[in-house]
Amino acid sequence: YKQEWHKNVILKARQLGFTTEVCIVQLDCALFESKKCALIAHTLHDAKRLFREKTKFAYDNLPEVIRLANPIKIETKEELVFSNGGSVTVSTSFRGGTLQRLHVSEFGKICAKYPEKAREIVSGAFQAVNDEGVITLESTAEGRQGYFFDYSQQAEKDQLANKELTAQDWRFFFFSWWQNPEYSMTAQALPDRLIAYFEKLQAKHGITLTDEQKSWYYSKEKTLGDDMKREYPSIPSEAFEQSIEGAYYAQQFNYLYTQNRIVESLPN
């Protein structure tokens, strides 16, 4: 939050709590700075759920003295408008009016599944944010195309080049699974391929993991399989890796090769 820029793109692992944080920050800005804030989710059901479970829940649990000092003027299932003019709105898009803060949750998913909606967000909601405002895009990866992929790639390149950003440039943030201390479990034996993988992470990227973290990764991978790197990337480039196109049994054959189960044809 302290490193926040005008335009922020956050590539992340799953379940790190960013949307919850944004809901709290937006509520704070609406209450104490009279700012107009909006949060966009990929479905209206999710937008309303976030509003109910994050924003409204936080507001209802504020001390009464704060709520009385700036009471709600308008309340719906998608919006809170306060007497000071500040507001928090959730939706699947936003067009018209002016915003000081905009957050788009799972923008990568929106780009992949609803490309026209993504275009509407870029052409409508982005343009509603004033020059001093803040836009934040947050998502796990969803393929190697679309606005989220393009913004992430360019922002990471700018970061690596130490480019001095303008207000129109995106600032890149990456948060991996191993940065969450909760992603840990009792140590267990690992297959050789994962031992080699973790050794490579340490040698090439300086990422040192505990045995408990490695075991958590192994356990989670058993369920996710080929989607593990997309959902829980260790480094940014992993997030956008794709399985071999057209290889229906790629994972199974990879396993057979690693177990030396592929042999020369046997004689009749």
Question: Where on the chain are the PLM-derived regions?
Answer:
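Phosphate/NTP-binding elements of NTP-utilizing enzymes
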Residues: Y1-N268
